[in-house]
Amino acid sequence: MPDVTRRVAIKRILSASVLAVPFSGVSGCGKSPAEDEVSAPEREEMAAVATAFMRKFDVPGLSVAIARNGRVVYENPFGESNRESAERLTVSNLFRIASVTKPITATSIFALIERGKLGQHDKVFGDGGVLGTRFGTVPYEKWVEEITIDQLLTHTCGGWDNSNDDPMFENPGMGHAQLITWTLDTKALKNPPGMHYAYSNFGYCVLGRVIEQISGRPYRDFAQEEILGRCGVRDMRIAGNTLEERLPEEVIYYGQNGENPYDMNVTRMDSHGGWLAAPRDLVLFLNHVDGFKSTPNILKPDTIKAMTTPGPVNSSYARGWAVNNAPNWWHNGSFPGTTTIMVRTASGFCWAALANTRKPGQPDIGLALDNMVWDMVRKVSAWHA
């Protein structure tokens, strides 16, 4: 997907939840507090906002989950998971989440840091690095051996950005090891590490291999067992690449303007863009890393603070999370057939919204998806959003 729409992805990330409403999510037990209840007229107004978004961007299926103070207070699927068969979307349908994966990978890294198995400023490549000389040809190109874990987390490794030659969208037949070796050998860094922000999918691919090296487990297993499972998430999976590899609960993706959702190696994107999820899954995850006391967090407060503190070069991006002064934390995702966002806000809300299409160009569907959920939340007067 090396097109101009990917180059604006980070603009979406940095501006998307400047508008975001407050949410935090996990399903609670017992009766919801009265202020959490959504009336029938309010639900109708929320649905009107969602369907207007769908009409504007020709969205087949849209699914939204919202939580407040540790309790899921709203879930609604709109439209179809499969246009051809007119199969209605359900709350359990799984979507590719694209770069909404990155907070999950960052949380996995910080879990290892918290356990003393990894250092935030450890070197990644070369003698003494976490990955040593496992990938690439020694001697490495200039600056490669200076890259640290933190620089990968903050997109300041010095190159390999998501421009027209993003390594993650080249050589689709290569596995992780081949692709990392090829990239180290053929794509020189553009800047010294730590000096320049450039959004890097490849950097998060490398972080997935760091997790595997330290934990001794495949990335997906570590994330499922040590992160998602501890949040009560059971159904998230790494996506396949083709329509034939579609899982039973997975939606069908629809490209627009000539985009093909099924010609990418999404499985290889595991740690930067490869997960499948339903909105509730993401809300459950958010609720357990949001730093609030309404639900137990899976990381210590100091660890969460380190993960969500703005980076040294770009004050709008922390470590796997876009951030602002509210402080709200969020991430969005975008590739052919997929538009996604999840948000944690300072006032105790979390949300996730997932769509099974992407419409390139302007107006920006990613920003519109963010605005849509804000508008939906503001329809509930008791939430004071």
Annotate each predicted stretch with a short phrase:
Residues G30-E35:
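Bacterial lipoprotein signal-peptidase II cleavage site
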Residues R71, F78, N82, T137-S334, ...:
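Short, surface-exposed loop or secondary-structure junction motifs
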Residues G119-P139, R230:
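Short, glycine/proline-biased beta-turn/loop segments that scaffold the active-site neighborhood
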Residues S39-F95, K117, G132-R134:
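Short, conserved catalytic-motif segment at the N-terminal edge
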Residues P2-D3, V8-C29:
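N-terminal export signals
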